């Protein structure tokens, strides 16, 4: 069993982590994946930015970049927070991997957001879909008779070369990947002229990802944790170990989880539309978990995934299993 090297003595009690290209990423951000109420994401961003957040995580697939752009426009208009104060991440969807589509869709994202450039742009998944429009003017994939996306013969290498062009063009500051396993990364690093700065994956106490982190640390690829609370599908808030640790520090279970990630050097991007919870989630910089408590959380690993590409795409894409 892999033993992590992160402990109470490691100085990860700060707001930012340095990336391998010299840029910095805020260690906790706001996720924007879906909202039943279109206005919710705008309100959440406004609330988050006014309460200390400077990291917003989005994606073209989420379908809300124009709404987010309108919200940011109003926030910037107030004058207290400027574009350069914010670290914005977006992602290239699977149906836009072709070399003639990458720049086009990055530009569309930037225009929808109205922010001039992206701080970080990720390949959302290491799988390409056929685009339903010959000109690639949509992210909607071409589907088979069962409604499942049709896989496109596009290599990650082809897509990554276009991602590198985005940096050269000044459209993005940093580039990275999401949902990549070690084999994907090994291959990518054989030809990448610009090394990915980030690999955004699902990480939480029931899916600790230590082996993946060991590899990423070796090549200075920072992990970012999506679904750090398990999308509400995990019983973290009733877990006796997590509740006991939270009580010890007089913090919430969520705070303990985010702090555990922080002390491992992993950025977290929890999603919430609740005003008080957004504020509470950010409140992790005034305490430090002991080595013993970190090991207790580490012991909870059960390799439970709440976001599986097999069920997500209806395609036999065994990325992790």
Curated annotation (Swiss-Prot):
This is Aldose reductase C. Coiled coil: none annotated. It comes from Dictyostelium discoideum (Social amoeba). Substrate binds at residue 124. GO terms for cellular component: cytosol. One of its GO terms (molecular function) is aldose reductase (NADPH) activity. The gene is alrC. NADP(+) binds at residues 22-31, 227-281. Its EC number is 1.1.1.21. It catalyses: an alditol + NAD(+) = an aldose + NADH + H(+); an alditol + NADP(+) = an aldose + NADPH + H(+).
């Amino acid at each position: 069993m892999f033993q992590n090297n992160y402990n109470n003595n490691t100085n990860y009690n700060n707001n930012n982590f340095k990336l391998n290209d010299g840029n910095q990423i805020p260690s906790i951000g706001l996720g924007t994946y879906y909202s039943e109420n279109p206005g919710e994401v705008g309100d959440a961003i406004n609330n988050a930015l006014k309460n200390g957040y400077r990291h917003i995580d989005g994606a073209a697939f989420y379908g809300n970049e124009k709404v987010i752009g309108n919200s940011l426009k109003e926030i910037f208009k107030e004058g207290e927070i400027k574009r350069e104060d914010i670290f914005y991440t977006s992602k290239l969807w699977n149906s836009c991997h072709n070399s003639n589509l990458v720049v086009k869709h990055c530009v569309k994202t930037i225009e929808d957001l109205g922010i001039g450039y992206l701080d970080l742009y990720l390949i959302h998944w290491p799988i390409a879909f056929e685009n339903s429009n010959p000109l690639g003017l949509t992210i909607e994939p071409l589907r088979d008779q069962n409604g499942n996306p049709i896989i496109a013969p596009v290599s990650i290498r082809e897509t990554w070369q276009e991602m590198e062009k985005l940096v050269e063009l000044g459209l993005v500051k940093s580039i990275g990947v999401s949902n990549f396993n070690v084999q994907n990364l090994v291959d990518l690093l054989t030809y990448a002229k610009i090394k990915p700065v980030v690999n955004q994956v699902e990480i939480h106490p029931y899916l600790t990802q230590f082996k993946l982190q060991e590899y990423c640390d070796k090549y200075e690829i920072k992990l970012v944790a999506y679904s750090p609370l398990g999308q509400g599908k995990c019983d973290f808030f009733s877990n006796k170990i997590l509740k006991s640790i939270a009580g010890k520090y007089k913090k919430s279970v969520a705070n303990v989880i985010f702090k555990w990630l922080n002390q491992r050097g992993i950025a977290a991007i929890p999603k919430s539309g609740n005003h008080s919870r957004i504020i509470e989630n950010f409140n992790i910089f005034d305490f430090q978990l002991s080595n013993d408590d970190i090991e207790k959380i580490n012991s909870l690993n059960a390799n439970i995934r709440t976001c599986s590409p097999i069920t997500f795409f209806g395609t036999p894409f065994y990325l992790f299993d």
